[in-house]
Structure formats: C-alpha cells, structure tokens
Amino acid sequence: MAEVIEGPLWSARNWSADEGEGSIHDDATATELGFRGGTVAGDVHMNQFPPVLLRVFGKEWFERGNLSLNFKNATIDQEKVQVFAEPRKSGEDSVKVWMEREDGLQVAVGSAAIGDHSKSELRQKDYRPCDPEDLRILNRVKPGMSLGSYNIHTRTDKQYQRYDAGLISDPLPWYRKGSPWGGSVAAPCTVMEYLWGYSMNGLAPLVGDSVGLFGAIEIGFEKGPFMMSRDYHLESRVVCVGQSPQTEYVWYETDAFDYLGDRVARLLIQSRAMKASSPAYQE
C-alpha cells in the first residue's frame, strides 16, 4: 500500500487578529463565542496544500486543478498543523486530502483533483435551500442573486509583503519570483483576496449583524494559473442559503475570466453567521 504524502508541520498565523472586536479572528470575540481564541482563517490553511499537491499532480494542478475543503475544527495563532494527501492511483485524477493539528485533531478534510471539478468534495453537497422565512440573519439573501461583476487587477504588494514577512504557510518561490508561466502565481490566500473579497461588496450589505466564519472553501483552475499583475473580470452569485442549529450559512460562487473570456479560476465558498453572535437571536 502506497504511503500517504505529508507536508511539514507548520505554525499557521492568524494574520487577521488585528481586525478588532466583532471578528472571529479577535481573541475576545472568539472566546465569548466558545472558541479558544481568535481563529486562523481557512484561506491561511489552504496556503499549506499546494506543495503537497505539486507532488501529487505536478504543476498541472495550478493550470486545471482544484482544492475542496470542509473545515472541521478551528485553530489559533501559531498552532502547528500538517497537510496530508492520499497517493494518486493509476487512471484517477482525484485524491483525498486533509489537515491535522499536531495532536491529531482534524482541522479540514476534502479532495483535490485535476480536470473534472464536478465531483469535488463540495460540489457533491445538497444545495437545496431552506425556507427563507426561517432565517433571521440571511433572510435578504436569495439563491441565484448576483453579488456583482467586477473588473480587477491583481496587484502584487500584499502577496509579496506576506511572503517576505513569512506569513504564508509553506510558501512556494513562485509566489514571489518567476514561475514556469513567467510571472508570479497567486497563492490560495490571494485567489481568496480577489474572488471572495470582491463578492463581499455585494453580500455584506445583505447580512444582518453577526460574527462570520468560513465553513468550506473550494478554489479551482480551468485555464490557470491565476497570475499576479493581470487583469480579470469577476462574476459572483449566490448558490443557496440554509441553517444549522448554531449558524445560518450562504453558499456563493465567483468566476474569474481573462481578457479572452476564458474562465481562469473559480471559488465556491460557504460563509457561516453564528446565531449566538446576532441580536436577531437574543430573545
């Protein structure tokens, strides 16, 4: 039996800790909601996967691969975590991947693949929405709703600063220097910075007062990589809304197109709003 492929133990950084009161990354806010401290964001953890995925799929992963994760347990600043992937079987283009804390606690579980994205961990989920009348925080968010169209330019400054400061977990030199495709490649956190960050312009005004966190994230490439210092057009939309006993959640998706109109990258994400943090649930 082939051995599981492992990445190094890495002290993941909560680089959003300074967002202040009302953020799940703030120690006081997170502790009040039952966490051990300000949580490390999911995109920080996603940065740790590409070196392992290069060993599984080669550089083709940045061209037409995906990474699809459900987050299971939150970590706090500088807790050590490690990435694992099953070896790729002959004739198969998808593998199971996961992340564990140093003590073995599962942080995230999902899939990675090249080629067909339709059978990923997150795209196999049931996206039938709940009755919107049951929602109190996300009651203005509707399936199919546009979250906007945006023309963007991928600036290098934030990614380079994070790279130089040692904040990107297990970083690839391609994030700062040249790559097989010429310029610098976007790290997963930078894909999120644009494809999630711009969609929040459309979503945030519709969300009631609450503390949010990521429940699941998938990034995928179709005609990648997603490069720095390039122009892209983004289209974002709501997939569905629903709830669990502790949260209300929204699934939404953003596509990035190049100047030829080809889809370069995709983001599918679940954002959760904690009921315990919302005045709408204070009865």
Question: Where are the predicted features?
Answer:
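Hydrophobic beta-strand-centered segment that forms part of the acyl-chain substrate-binding groove
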Residues: 44-87, 91, 109, 191-238, ...
